[in-house]
């Protein structure tokens, strides 16, 4: 799904800001709500290949493929081939990851960097533990660690406090990259560093100097952006768009990896897709119940005299599954911190789209636990059901992404603008004009910057195609004749801008057409209006 030419608003922002210099990206990005490392990466590509959506999408896909490769490399070596293969499978076929992997945004790369950071922090902790054993740790052979499935031979590698220096460097660099890619990356990297610090203080104080040096360098390199963060936090607190809708928000938090918009609206594509998803759900439920029953029966036979709850706790908290606990704790920590921040800032920032930043450690947990399930029927059934949902999700995404309907409103806008000698084009909906500013660069457009905060500064990324005004009067002052108004609605209807302008005594609507745009699942309106008098 990377060869289509469509973008939605967030993607349009990535594309537009990449056309600026590194310094300009830093400045313009200060008005946005994300750090700028991803935009810098796009700017490098733009300098080499020009504004090329295919190149940008391949770049984002590379982030997910890098995540999948961790399964075949780091995870396979640390936790066994089963866990590695499962992790790669989930990285490539989790429906939501498949969707964002072709979206021109920073998520695929921040998921990779957070996961890489977490894995190497775990490696460092395990190595320090093996070299600083305590009574009660159990028998630890030289170079062997019971928290990992493989031993590491450090001969020939430069070490800092008994740990290969390259591991420290990978951990510190991926931590810094996470922070410069997304603010949830900041949260994840902070918790990873914090938990490693606690472990070092408790078990390997000799390594404290290395950790502190790395932490100080990270903070020093991130300090310039902290100046920007303060202003961005003010924007989020005062004018952020996200809000709670019960129970939808809770459902999104819990099930977003598989419960994508394509799965939710599968019935609008045909009953066959609903039937397939229903079969997948039944197969998953039956497989899970079969596996659980089989597991409890086997361990009750091996552990007579113990309660089932104690057996379950013993297996879930077994040493071999501690890395899975690490993944869940990290994910839960980020979620909790974001929830607390939302309460403090009185603005919802616990958005499922942001939670996916730490989905890598969560997938690691699932992969490790599944790798310890002995029932092949259970595992195969779960994976088959998961793959079925993923295929349906991808088929529907491709159907929407490559639909010719996506181009209809853009073509009509260009035709209307051309036939009216490039008139004034207005909208207060940046979701529409962000897209048209990228897709129809030859049409000058004007945006009504109504939002409080610093958003208008962020939208300078669309200059010179898009310019801003503070009111309709400012846009129409001294103007006479035909102009175009753009709008977007979730259901078919008249956009608010058209209604507002039509209510003026000096404005009338002469033509209006509405198009369904499958890629965004919204209705796109192009209205031709005339202003009489001065």
What feature does the model see in each segment?
Residues 127-165, 301-313:
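Intrinsically disordered, low-complexity terminal tails and inter-domain linkers enriched
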Residues 1-128, 165-530:
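Membrane-proximal helix-loop-helix interfaces that form the catalytic/acceptor-binding platform
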Residues 532-534:
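Short, solvent-exposed mixed-charge patches
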């Amino acid at each position: 799904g990377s060869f289509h030419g469509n973008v939605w608003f967030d993607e349009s922002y990535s594309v537009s800001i990449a056309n600026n210099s590194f310094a300009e990206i830093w400045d313009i990005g200060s008005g946005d709500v994300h750090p700028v490392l991803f935009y810098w990466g796009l700017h490098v590509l733009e300098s080499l290949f020009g504004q090329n959506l295919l190149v940008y999408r391949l770049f984002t896909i590379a982030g997910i493929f890098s995540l999948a490769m961790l399964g075949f490399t780091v995870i396979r070596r640390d936790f066994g081939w089963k866990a590695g293969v499962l992790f790669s499978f989930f990285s490539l076929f989790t429906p939501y990851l498949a969707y964002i992997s072709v979206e021109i945004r920073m998520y695929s790369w921040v998921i990779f960097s957070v996961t890489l950071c977490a894995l190497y922090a775990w490696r460092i902790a395990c190595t320090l533990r093996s070299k600083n054993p305590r009574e009660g740790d159990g028998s630890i052979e030289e170079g062997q660690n019971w928290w990992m499935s493989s031993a590491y031979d450090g001969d020939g590698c430069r070490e800092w406090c008994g740990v290969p220096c390259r591991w420290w460097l990978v951990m510190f660099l991926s931590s810094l990259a996470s922070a410069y890619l997304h603010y949830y990356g900041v949260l994840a990297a902070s918790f990873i560093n914090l938990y490693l610090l606690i472990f070092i203080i408790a078990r390997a104080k000799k390594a404290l100097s290395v950790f502190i040096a790395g932490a100080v360098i990270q903070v020093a390199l991130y300090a310039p952006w902290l100046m920007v963060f303060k202003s961005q936090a003010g924007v989020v607190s005062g004018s952020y768009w996200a809000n709670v809708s019960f129970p939808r928000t809770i459902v999104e938090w819990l099930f977003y990896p598989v419960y994508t918009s394509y799965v939710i609206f599968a019935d609008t594509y045909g009953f066959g897709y609903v039937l397939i998803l229903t079969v997948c759900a039944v197969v998953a439920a039956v497989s899970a119940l079969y596996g659980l029953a089989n597991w409890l029966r086997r361990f009750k036979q091996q552990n007579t005299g113990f309660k089932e709850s104690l057996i379950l706790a013993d297996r879930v908290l077994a040493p071999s599954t501690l890395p899975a606990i690490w993944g869940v704790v990290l994910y839960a920590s980020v979620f909790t911190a974001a929830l607390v921040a939302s309460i403090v800032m009185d603005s919802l920032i616990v958005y499922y789209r942001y939670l996916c930043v730490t989905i890598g450690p969560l997938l690691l947990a699932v992969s490790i636990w599944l790798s310890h399930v002995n029932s092949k029927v259970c595992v195969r059934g779960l994976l088959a059901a998961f793959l079925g949902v993923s295929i349906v999700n991808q088929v529907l995404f491709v159907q929407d992404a490559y639909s010719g309907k996506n181009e209809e409103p853009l073509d009509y806008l260009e035709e209307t603008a051309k036939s009216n000698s490039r008139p004034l084009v207005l909208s207060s909906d940046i979701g529409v004009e962000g897209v048209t500013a990228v897709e129809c660069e030859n049409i000058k457009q004007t945006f009504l910057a109504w939002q409080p905060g610093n958003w208008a500064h962020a939208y300078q990324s669309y200059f010179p195609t898009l310019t801003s005004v503070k009111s309709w009067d400012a846009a129409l002052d001294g103007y006479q004749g035909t102009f175009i108004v753009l709008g977007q609605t979730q259901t078919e209807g008249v956009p608010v801008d058209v209604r507002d302008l039509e209510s003026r005594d000096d404005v009338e609507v002469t033509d209006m057409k509405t198009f369904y745009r499958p890629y965004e699942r919204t209705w796109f309106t192009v209205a031709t209006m005339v202003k009489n008098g001065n």
